[in-house]
Amino acid sequence: MAAQKINEGLEHLAKAEKYLKTGFLKWKPDYDSAASEYGKAAVAFKNAKQFEQAKDACLREAVAHENNRALFHAAKAYEQAGMMLKEMQKLPEAVQLIEKASMMYLENGTPDTAAMALERAGKLIENVDPEKAVQLYQQTANVFENEERLRQAVELLGKASRLLVRGRRFDEAALSIQKEKNIYKEIENYPTCYKKTIAQVLVHLHRNDYVAAERCVRESYSIPGFNGSEDCAALEQLLEGYDQQDQDQVSDVCNSPLFKYMDNDYAKLGLSLVVPGGGIKKKSPATPQAKPDGVTATAADEEEDEYSGGLC
C-alpha cells in the first residue's frame, strides 16, 4: 500500500514538472495545473507516511500558487508543509512555516484564517518553547482585536498570561492580565474582572510589590458590583494579612475555595504565597500548666473552696 502511494506521488510530481515546462508553442508555465499536481503528490506521500517528501511537495505547491498570485492557496500549502514538519517532530520549523502562512492570509484579507493558524502554531510549540507560544498567542489576540472580535482576543491573552505566570515572568504577566481585565470591562463581563483582579494581586505580591497589589484593588472599586463582592472581601483580607505579615491569615484566604478553584496557575501562586520575613504565626491558646507543689490556689479556686460547703 505504501509503495503504491509513493509511486502515485512520484507520478503527480512528474506531471507537475511537465506543466511547468515551456516550449515553442507554450511560452508560460501552467502554474495552476502544476500546483494541483503537487497537492495530489503531497496527499499521496502523506498517506504513505513519507512526511519529508510530502513537505517538499507542499512547498512546491506553495511556490506554484505564489507564481500564480493565488496567495490564499499558497498560504494553505505552506501551512500544510508546516503540519508535515510537525509529524516529523520538527516543531520550530513547523511554526516558522505556519507563521509565514498566517502573514499571507493577512495579506490576502482573511484575518480569521490567519488568527486560527497562529493559534495552532502556539499550541504546537507551547510545551517546547513557551516564550514563542506567548508571542504567537499575543499576535493572535492582536489580529482578533483589530477585527473587533474581543471575546476571542481576550481568550488568547488569557493563554499568554497563564504561560507567563508559569514561567514566572511576573512583570509581563501583570501587564497581560491588565489588558485582559480592560477587555472584560469593555464587554461588561464584570464577574470575570473580579477574578482577574485576584490574579493581578497574586502576581504583584509574588513581585513583592504590595503597593501595586493594593492599587489594583482600589482601582477595581469602580467596576460595578466589585465593592461588596466576596472577591473584594477576600482581597482586602489577603492584603491586610500580607501587610501585617500574618502568614496564617494569608494562607487561610489562599486556601479558600474562591482562590483554590481559579485557573491552576493562579491557584498555585496563592498556595505558594509567603509574606515578607517569613511571617508570624497566630499564637495558639496557652495550655494550662500543672501547678507545682506548694503553690497557692488561684482566686477562682479559692472562691470555689469558699462555697464548697454550701451557703449556710
UniProtKB/Swiss-Prot annotation:
Q: List compositional bias (Acidic residues) regions by residue number.
A: 300-312
Q: Name one GO biological process term.
A: protein stabilization
Q: Which Pfam families match?
A: SNAP
Q: Where in the cell is it found?
A: Membrane; Golgi apparatus
Q: How does it assemble?
A: Interacts with RAB11FIP5. Interacts with VTI1A.
What the protein does? Answer: Required for vesicular transport between the endoplasmic reticulum and the Golgi apparatus.
The name this protein goes by in its record: Gamma-soluble NSF attachment protein
What's the source species for this entry? Homo sapiens
What gene name is listed for this protein? NAPG
